[in-house]
Every structure is written in C-alpha cells, then in structure tokens.
C-alpha cells in the first residue's frame, strides 16, 4: 500500500512578530495630469521609474525620469509607434 507523507512548512515561524510586518512606503508613481488638461511650465506630468513614457514636444525629463512641462499649454498623451508612448505639451494660442 502506498502511503504519502505530506508536510507543510510555515513560511514564518510562529514565535514572534517583531521581525515581520515591514513594508516600504508607496512612491506615488503615475500620471499627475490628464490628457487635455491645461498646465503651466514646470508642472509635473508623470512620475515613473525608467522610461515607461517618453518626453515629447515641450516636455523635459528629470534625473529620476519624471516628465515635466517646459511651457504653459495643453497636455497630450500620444503613441510613438506600436509599443511606445509619449507625452507632449502644446501651447494654447493667445486671443487678442
């Protein structure tokens, strides 16, 4: 007769909880302005790690890959080919 001896091991020892329960704070990454929204120069548009979204027209890239507006205008999220995205800021024409 075949007898299986299954043992399940605890992922945490059942002793104390002082070494458990740590987690890092969220970094609040992602879009900070929506498509079509009016922004002023210097406004943060997108916080990211790496280049998930590339800078387009009138958009700069900071040291931590944050995208920011260089001029006042309207935000546009656009596609760059099949697998890339970019964000651009187009100035609004001033009416006289």
UniProtKB/Swiss-Prot annotation:
Stretches for region Disordered: 14-36
The superkingdom of the source organism is Bacteria
The cellular component terms of Gene Ontology attached to this UniProt record, alphabetical and capped at eight, are: cytosolic large ribosomal subunit
MF terms from GO for this chain are:
structural constituent of ribosome
Mind listing the GO biological process terms from this record? translation
UniProt keyword Nucleotidyltransferase, yes or no: no
Which residues are part of the propeptide segment? 1-9
Q: Which PROSITE patterns match?
A: RIBOSOMAL_L27
Name-wise, this protein is Large ribosomal subunit protein bL27
The record lists the organism as Bacillus anthracis
């Amino acid at each position: 007769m075949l007898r299986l001896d299954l043992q399940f091991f605890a992922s945490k020892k059942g002793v104390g909880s002082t070494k458990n329960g740590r987690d890092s704070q969220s970094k609040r990454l992602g879009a900070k302005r929506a498509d079509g929204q009016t922004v002023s120069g210097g406004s943060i548009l997108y916080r990211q790690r790496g280049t998930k979204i590339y800078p387009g027209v009138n958009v700069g890239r900071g040291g931590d890959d944050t995208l920011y507006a260089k001029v006042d205008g309207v935000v546009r999220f656009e596609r760059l080919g099949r697998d890339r995205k970019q964000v651009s800021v187009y100035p609004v024409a001033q009416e006289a």
